[in-house]
Amino acid sequence: MEPLKFNALLKSTIWGGEKIIPFKHLDVQQENVGESWEISGVPGNETVVANGEYAGKKLNELVHELKGKLVGEANYKRFGDEFPLLIKFIDARQDLSIQVHPTDEIAKRQGKERGKTEMWYLLPSDADATLLCGLKQQITPTQYAEMVENDTICDAISRYDVKEGDCFFLPAGRIHAIGTGCFLAEIQQTSDVTYRIYDFKRKDKNGNYRELHTKQAAECINYNVESNYRTEYTPQKNQGVSLVQCPYFNTAVYDLDEPMTIDYSELDSFVILIGLKGEGTITDNEGNTTTLRAGESILVPATTETLKVEGNVKFLETYV
């Protein structure tokens, strides 16, 4: 079964910029594109297959039809017809709200299906781009509520100057916000549970403040303080470099300028490749060939045993 490409869902937002369309080499007229949903099984926002014999089918339809052949037997037992990951590109022309996501346990207690753990990988961003990630000082839930009320919550959160290649892991409970000028790839659990903590007192087009979820968020926040929330890793050429390993996804980055064959014969999972830079050709063990270039995301079925990658190409690899 050949690797699958999808028609991305472009989302215009009040904070969206102009980086996504040229990055994805698209010939479309759409302004303020803040997000490109690359591979999604979120109900109502399912991406549609763009190539091969399954062209025109929604991702969740394909999971239902192919089951473990597509996602892996263990994943199908765990998630059923729901695809477990959501892949996005995000371009922030303005600051996004400060947010937190619940753990699976807390989400179920609050009547939600599951929580959300995610990660960010920075693409070429503005020179002065920053983001917020994790508490930098010990606060109590009571102090948190007071800081939200008096507009000082940002003082308690670590702010990072960011550049291309930076990586941040966001386990459920870690407070965070994407800042102005950030352009990034996001890998997350399939979940729409987001609690907005603070929105910089902004008003929508109707003059209303956006809803905050201060109380729900207080239960979700991990109040532990860490010295560094940025993932430290050493870039390497022509090999996979692990960025994140967690129960929800495992992610590595590859930066290739010579051919490489990746062995998936022992892996019981789909694999997603997210193009970051350059262009390459991938050929699977059945002889199916497709291109992978910056701005493209490819779903490799679980039945695939090997992938040969050729070309000058940099990409993320993620699987469950």
Per-segment meaning from a language model:
Residues 1-139, 199-227, 251:
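Transition-metal
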Residues 80-82, 90-95, 104, 125-128, ...:
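Ligand-binding loop in jelly-roll beta-barrel domains
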Residues 87-88, 96, 118-121, 159-160, ...:
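His/acidic/aromatic-lined binding-pocket segments of jelly-roll/cupin-type domains
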Residues 138-150, 268-279:
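Short, basic/aromatic beta-hairpin or loop at an interaction surface
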Residues 147-195:
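Loop-centered beta-sheet repeat module
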Residues 157-169, 284-304:
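Short acidic-glycine-tyrosine-enriched beta hairpin
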Residues 195-263, 267:
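C-terminal amphipathic alpha-helical segment
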Residues 261-262, 278-283, 297:
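Short beta-strand segments in beta-sandwich/barrel cores
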